[in-house]
Amino acid sequence: MNIIDQVKQTLVEEIAASINKAGLADEIPDIKIEVPKDTKNGDYATNIAMVLTKIAKRNPREIAQAIVDNLDTEKAHVKQIDIAGPGFINFYLDNQYLTAIIPEAIEKGDQFGHVNESKGQNVLLEYVSANPTGDLHIGHARNAAVGDALANILTAAGYNVTREYYINDAGNQITNLARSIETRFFEALGDNSYSMPEDGYNGKDIIEIGKDLAEKHPEIKDYSEEARLKEFRKLGVEYEMAKLKNDLAEFNTHFDNWFSETSLYEKGEILEVLAKMKELGYTYEADGATWLRTTDFKDDKDRVLIKNDGTYTYFLPDIAYHFDKVKRGNDILIDLFGADHHGYINRLKASLETFGVDSNRLEIQIMQMVRLMENGKEVKMSKRTGNAITLREIMDEVGVDAARYFLTMRSPDSHFDFDMELAKEQSQDNPVYYAQYAHARICSILKQAKEQGIEVTAANDFTTITNEKAIELLKKVADFEPTIESAAEHRSAHRITNYIQDLAAHFHKFYNAEKVLTDDIEKTKAHVAMIEAVRITLKNALAMVGVSAPESM
């Protein structure tokens, strides 16, 4: 339990003890503690006096006064109490309790903010999963940034997380990839008789693959068409996936598992789920096609599994894949999908219900569109290539840290304008620079302290920390673990970037109001330990969203 929860629990226990002591109720109802909207009304407030009115048969203000008169303020860490309005009780805490967070942060280091106990739940988080047919773009970048941050947050909150990328290496798009490579392969050999398929891939990367294969494996030209296309499918996917993996690694995004769609066919899992759905009576034949009765489970219409030409829809392997996720022992399945996949939510949930799996175990987040902006105008195409701007170009333009931070700053269900000019600014108007500068500034002070012979230690006397800005800063440090738990519960990575901005702002305010290194040695030691706790917190929070914490800037 974090320090904030400990203090709240103690306050609730002491209020309950006070009610008993005052003889207000034999059975005490739930005591709710809330943080007042206006900090002038205290650190915490409760309406328990009004709740007790019918039980105690007294005026709520009288009840409130009785609670106040019988409260052990020392045990409750309370220095002042006000009764407001019809009977609200406002508590102002003795903030010395907050200083306990300093040694805790220093001792835990990189693990500060992480919960100590496992939730005992396995989470499979699938994100990015771009088709291996070209470069990653800004939409994939947002998916990667949010997905990786969410994996870090859930891990810190005590979940057992598997990060997975689903490789769409089967289906028509891979056939089109193979046909496109075939055309470029023969062109490189001087044979222009192979035309590009209607839905082919015309990128420079396909030309490069064709040239490379013509140079290294000219013997492929003598293969049968079937064997040749099989080879081009395999080599094309390998080439594109190697490039995608390299870009994602540079973007500081890593996966535990790369799951191949082809493996579902090879292991017979698609036929297995199809047979199971038929056996359970959830499929039917109509218009020469095989349908799944997803309307039985709140979908707006039934879905085709096998088309009238005998080919599978994308939905069938998707069902097999999600059933495989369940079979692997995952309690929670989280999918991060692009904006064009909104219609998938109900049908995928319905498909799980056909197997008796609670569809609430599947959570789908839709990543809304991102617009790249420069000088107030949308940038749609790369100036260098004339094509859509790639993840690699974004990294080259603004850097990994800025890209990761900006793409995690907003809720994924909201549209977002990525200001590339702001992301490159080295000023405090740039959110990531502002946060990183706070860390670098702390490192500079700690370096000066060390030069003066003042070492960071968790065993200081912290009673000298009384400045209002210092207390507010410590409150923010103490709020780190609750913020992680909240971000994990709501699957909201942007709660961490919001926290980082607030923490950096509180530090800058403290820095401007209070000198850390002074002639008062005991106070200096306490402040040095405090800002080390802030530094650890800031570094851990930045790491959670995949951003570095530089020691100098």
Curated annotation (Swiss-Prot):
GO BP term, pick one: arginyl-tRNA aminoacylation
Keywords for this protein: Aminoacyl-tRNA synthetase, ATP-binding, Cytoplasm, Ligase, Nucleotide-binding, Protein biosynthesis
Gene name as annotated: argS
Subcellular location: Cytoplasm
Name of the featured protein: Arginine--tRNA ligase
Highest taxon of source: Bacteria
GO MF entry, a single one: ATP binding
PANTHER family in alphabetical order: ARGININE--TRNA LIGASE, CYTOPLASMIC (PTHR11956:SF5), ARGINYL-TRNA SYNTHETASE (PTHR11956)
Subunit structure of this chain's protein: Monomer.
PROSITE patterns: AA_TRNA_LIGASE_I (PS00178)
Disulfide bonds: none
The enzyme's E.C. designation: 6.1.1.19
Record-linked CDD domains: ArgRS_core (cd00671)
Tagged with keyword Nucleotide-binding: yes
Organism: Staphylococcus aureus (strain JH9)
Alphabetized InterPro entries for the sequence: aa-tRNA-synth_I_CS (IPR001412), Arg-tRNA-ligase (IPR001278), Arg-tRNA-synth_N (IPR005148), Arg-tRNA-synth_N_sf (IPR036695), ArgRS_core (IPR035684), DALR_anticod-bd (IPR008909), Rossmann-like_a/b/a_fold (IPR014729), tRNAsynth_Ia_anticodon-bd (IPR009080)
Reaction equations catalysed: tRNA(Arg) + L-arginine + ATP = L-arginyl-tRNA(Arg) + AMP + diphosphate
SUPFAM superfamilies xrefs: Anticodon-binding domain of a subclass of class I aminoacyl-tRNA synthetases (SSF47323), Arginyl-tRNA synthetase (ArgRS), N-terminal 'additional' domain (SSF55190), Nucleotidylyl transferase (SSF52374)
Record's GO cellular component terms: cytoplasm
Sequence motif 'HIGH' region, location on chain: 130-140
Entry similarity comment: Belongs to the class-I aminoacyl-tRNA synthetase family.
Primary subcellular site in the record, as a coarse category: cytoplasm
Pfam families attached to this UniProt entry: Arg_tRNA_synt_N (PF03485), DALR_1 (PF05746), tRNA-synt_1d (PF00750)
Gene3D superfamilies reported in the protein's UniProt record: Arginyl tRNA synthetase N-terminal domain, HUPs, Isoleucyl-tRNA Synthetase, Domain 1
